[in-house]
């Protein structure tokens, strides 16, 4: 059995060797998708287009080598002003035409895509005297008006903004109390200061503080409330503040002083 099998293999080898040699590339491989490296598909066939067209992917025309767009009709001519020795602008009739260099890919047919400068309404000039038709008197008047405007603007700025930003002068409330400070303070004390609510138009000065003087009606209402309760609640305090035109702090201090006075009176009675 083993001999017969060997003979069969030998016959197959001899038949394969006797056949004519074939080219590997010409063989139609059934598993071409599994072995793409044998005969790779060109990358050009996979692209949507054989070459990159910038006009297809860009909305606007591409810039040329010199950095300008390839349409000369969108550039208009302008005049360059000249300066005299004293710095004034003189009228000039020389018109300098600036046109960008055309790129290799630009053509005359592209000019229809853009309107010509003659069809467009020019913007009004913001300065007088730049065009070629301006006279020297107009230029001088414009220069004088500009200089006058700058001087007025600088003066207005100094008068309005600079006094508030002058930090070199010290603030009056930061200065030490010297002789000048004492005189200024004495002069301010002599002024008639408005009295607060419920002061009965009287202010009694004790050292550097002012003591509140209650009116008869305010003292009567506070005394009645104290005999009702020696400790006032916050709700009642707000009600008395509205009724007597006093602050809650003034009412609180009055009750504290009234309780202290009541304790002293009780101690005197015990003694």
Curated annotation (Swiss-Prot):
The keyword Metal-binding does not apply. It comes from the Eukaryota. It is found in: Nucleus; Chromosome, Centromere, Kinetochore; Chromosome. Its main location: nucleus. Residues 207-266 bind DNA. GO terms for molecular function: DNA binding; DNA-binding transcription factor activity, RNA polymerase II-specific. Residues 189-202 have a biased composition (Polar residues). GO terms for cellular component: kinetochore; nucleus. The keyword Cell inner membrane does not apply. Residues 100-117, 125-135 have a biased composition (Low complexity). Pfam families: Homeodomain. Residues 1-25, 100-135, 178-202 are annotated as: Disordered. InterPro entries: Caudal_homeobox, HD, Homeobox_CS, Homeodomain-like_sf. Keywords: Activator, Centromere, Chromosome, Developmental protein, DNA-binding, Homeobox, Kinetochore, Nucleus, Transcription, Transcription regulation. Interacts with tir-1 and let-756. Belongs to the Caudal homeobox family. Transcriptional activator. Interacts with promoter regions for tbx-8.9, tbx-9, elt-1, hnd-1, scrt-1, and vab-7 genes. Binds the sequence ATTTATGAC. Binds to the enhancer region of the hlh-1 gene promoter during embryonic body wall muscle development. Activates the gene for mab-5 in embryo development. Necessary for vab-7 expression in C blastomeres in the posterior of embryos. Required for posterior V6 neuroectoblast cell fate specification during postembryonic neurogenesis (patterning) which generates the characteristic ray lineage during male tail development. This is Homeobox protein pal-1. The lineage of its organism: Eukaryota, Metazoa, Ecdysozoa, Nematoda, Chromadorea.
């Amino acid at each position: 059995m083993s001999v017969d099998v060997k003979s069969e293999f030998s016959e197959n080898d001899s038949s394969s060797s006797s056949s004519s040699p074939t080219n590997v590339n010409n063989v139609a491989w059934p598993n071409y998708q599994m072995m793409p490296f044998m005969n790779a598909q060109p990358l050009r066939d996979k692209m949507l287009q054989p070459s990159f067209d910038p006009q297809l992917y860009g909305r606007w025309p591409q810039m040329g080598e010199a950095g300008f767009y390839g349409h000369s009709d969108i550039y208009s001519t302008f005049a360059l002003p000249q300066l005299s020795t004293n710095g004034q602008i003189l009228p000039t009739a020389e018109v300098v035409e600036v046109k960008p260099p055309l790129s290799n890919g630009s053509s005359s047919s592209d000019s229809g895509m853009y309107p010509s400068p003659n069809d467009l309404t020019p913007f009004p000039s913001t300065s007088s005297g730049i065009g070629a038709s301006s006279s020297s008197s107009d230029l001088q008047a414009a220069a004088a008006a500009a200089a006058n405007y700058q001087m007025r603007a600088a003066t207005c700025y100094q008068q309005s903004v600079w006094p508030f930003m002058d930090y070199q002068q010290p603030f009056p409330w930061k200065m030490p109390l010297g002789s000048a400070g004492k005189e200024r303070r004495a002069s301010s004390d002599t002024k008639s200061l408005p009295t607060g609510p419920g002061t009965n138009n009287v202010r009694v000065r004790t050292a550097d503080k002012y003591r509140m003087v209650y009116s008869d009606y305010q003292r009567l209402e506070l005394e009645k409330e104290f005999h009702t309760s020696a400790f006032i609640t916050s709700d009642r305090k707000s009600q008395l503040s509205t009724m007597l035109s006093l602050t809650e702090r003034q009412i609180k201090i009055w009750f504290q002083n009234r309780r202290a006075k009541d304790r002293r009176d009780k101690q005197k009675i015990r003694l």
